[in-house]
Regions:
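Non-catalytic signal-transmission and effector/linker regions of two-component phosphorelay proteins
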Residues: 1-10, 40, 91, 98-118
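Conserved beta-strand positions in the Rossmann-like core of class I SAM-dependent methyltransferases
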Residues: 10, 34, 79
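Conserved acidic carboxylate
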Residues: 13
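Two-component/phosphorelay signaling modules centered on CheY-like receiver
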Residues: 16-34
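Acidic, metal-coordinating helix/loop segments flanking the phosphotransfer/catalytic sites
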Residues: 35-52
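Active-site residues of response regulator receiver
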Residues: 56
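Acidic catalytic/metal-coordinating carboxylates
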Residues: 61-66
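A short, hydrophobic beta-strand element within the central beta-sheet of small alpha/beta folds
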Residues: 75-87
Length: 118
């Protein structure tokens, strides 16, 4: 269960239950999880060294794209969580990013954060 041991993962999600579920799943596989429920919090969290970021597209105080742009410039791999069905723009803008539909199945989330395929 140490598939993510030593990795620090940001989970930016404003739905408390979903944030808790994602954080718990990643922590169960050994990740150190940093959480944020707002754009302001996600920006603050992006100041530390991150190995991956799991980002809700729409946070309580705004769109996550400014944080995603910053993380992209820093070379941090990202996985977007969304309930939207049309996400072509995300994969065009952030070519290396993965997109998962909410709620993400644990094995798909793990594969995305590890960088592999489920």
């Amino acid at each position: 269960m140490d598939a993510l041991a030593g990795r620090t993962v940001l989970v930016a999600e404003d739905e408390p239950l979903l944030q808790q579920e994602v954080a718990h799943t990643l922590a169960a596989y050994g990740a150190r999880v940093v959480t944020a429920d707002s754009l302001v919090g996600a920006f603050a969290a992006s100041e530390q060294t991150l190995d991956h970021a799991v980002l809700d597209i729409h946070l309580s105080d705004g769109d996550v794209h400014p944080v995603a742009a910053r993380l992209s410039r820093l070379g941090v791999p990202m996985t977007f969580l969304t309930s939207e069905h049309r996400c072509e723009g995300l994969t065009r803008t952030y070519r290396a990013a993965r997109v998962l539909q909410k709620p993400a199945l644990p094995h798909l989330l793990l594969a995305a954060v590890r960088g592999g395929r489920a």
